[in-house]
């Protein structure tokens, strides 16, 4: 039985997002919106980095990085929960 495998993006966070989307997880929509907000933050930073004070730029960058890392970990865990639920559904076999 041939299966069309989804190619990796070579970015663990993006791959986890893709897995969550493909699994029709209800968390995908919320996490996707959060990812867009963080991306908008990076766009703001890149647009204004030459006119921001160095401390402000450093603190804002750290905050964005922390938010992105936290979100990627939440997405990773949500993917684990999907697999856990799939395994649970096999118990009666």
Residue ranges and their predicted role:
Residues 1-26:
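Immediate post-signal-peptide N-terminus of mature secreted/exported proteins
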Residues 4, 22, 29, 55, ...:
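Short, solvent-exposed segments of well-ordered alpha helices
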Residues 16-19, 34, 67:
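Charge-rich, solvent-exposed alpha-helical interaction surfaces
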Residues 25-33, 79:
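Surface-exposed patches in mature extracellular/periplasmic domains of secreted proteins
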Residues 36-93:
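Compact alpha-helical subdomains of small soluble proteins
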């Amino acid at each position: 039985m041939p299966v069309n495998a989804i190619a990796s993006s070579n970015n663990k966070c993006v791959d986890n997002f893709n897995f969550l989307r493909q699994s029709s997880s209800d968390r995908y929509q919320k996490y996707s919106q959060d990812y867009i907000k963080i991306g908008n933050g990076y766009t703001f930073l890149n647009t204004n980095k030459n006119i921001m004070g160095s401390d402000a730029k450093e603190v804002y960058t750290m905050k964005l990085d922390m938010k992105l890392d936290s979100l990627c970990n939440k997405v990773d865990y949500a993917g684990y929960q999907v697999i856990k639920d799939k395994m649970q559904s096999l118990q009666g076999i």
